[in-house]
């Protein structure tokens, strides 16, 4: 009876041995390639994680169930200092949550590299009370890369940001700075909101 060459046991064994050799070489020849700024990204993420942990030890309010990463940086839907309330079709909460993850600091480091910001550079920064997580991520990236920010911040916040009157962004920033958790503080503050120029 006729058997095609590929079905012969000898050929199948040779193919199996060849495949095993290829798998062995593939597994043992892998090389880890790190992106530019990898060490700064890891450091910034670690700094942000420690900053959030320290901040949580200083606050006296219950962390919202909406705060998926339990950062303590997600505010309330509306308050006396809310500059823009969430309306149907405008999801402000997800953006507030996203920037509270420590990996957001690594994303800021990536942006620094894209903008060719280097160690010892001085940068101008405008912070908003609407995104306290992004503010802390930026400060963490600055610390990791030894970049000095000159900061102007807004005191108000949109829904879910630093909009608790007793924990507005200026108060959070002062609390972190006075407890030596962050190295930089705003040089000026604006009220915030739509008419803030």
Predicted regions, residues:
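Short, Lys/Arg-rich N-terminal segment immediately upstream of the first membrane anchor
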Residues: 1-8
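Hydrophobic membrane-insertion alpha-helices, especially the h-region
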Residues: 10-28
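Electropositive phosphate-/nucleotide-binding environments in soluble metabolic enzymes
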Residues: 11, 98, 102-106
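Ser/Thr/Pro/Gly-rich low-complexity linker/stalk segments immediately outside membranes or between
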Residues: 30-44
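N-terminal, Lys/Arg-enriched amphipathic/low-complexity engagement segments
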Residues: 43-101
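Membrane-embedded segments
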Residues: 103, 109-115, 119-167
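A substrate-binding/cap region within the structured catalytic cores of diverse enzymes
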Residues: 168-197
